[in-house]
Amino acid sequence: VKVFIGISKNRSEYKGTDIMLRAAKHIKEKHPERMELYVVEGVPFNEYVMLMNSSDIIMDQLYSYTPAMNALQAMSQGLICMGGGEEENYEILNEKELRPIINVQPTYESVCKQLEYIVLHPELIPSLKKDGIEYIKKHHDHIKVAKKYEALYNKLLDKS
């Protein structure tokens, strides 16, 4: 299982990257034959994306309830997001079926538990990747989002 974590020096603690990295290193040490860990810091964006896209899982935004832009881009490319994927995220979107995000609580123990589980059950990866792509198409397609904004703006203009 190929796991990717991008480090933003000045925002590591803010994003929870410090905890996620420590947990990832622990699971890599525990299961070296089952997991590859890509830690990327301070590289040009094109290189960052290339390295990210060669992975199975991106670890991002430990303290968030929802995936951020980095995770959404990764999911659109078929990566699995491990990070914020609380039920409130799905409720806001009225999503009843798809659960592509491996949700973790903001603790070292939770990250270790979820990461070890997926490392020991790689057979789950293809369906999570497929669900992630479907989730992006369904809820984050740029045309659909633009049409929702257009409808909102038109509704607001009609009220004035």
Residues covered by each model-derived region:
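Acidic donor-binding loop of glycosyltransferase active sites
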Residues: N53-T66, L79
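A charged, aromatic-enriched C-terminal amphipathic alpha-helix characteristic of glycosyltransferases
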Residues: E123-N154
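Short hydrophobic beta-strand element within catalytic cores of glycosyltransferases
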Residues: I80-E87
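Short alpha-helical segment that forms part of, or immediately flanks, the ligand-binding pocket
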Residues: V49, A71-S76, Y90-E91
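Active-site donor-sugar recognition loop in glycosyltransferases
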Residues: E47, L62-P67, E88
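Active-site donor-binding acidic/aromatic loop of nucleotide-activated sugar
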Residues: M35-V43
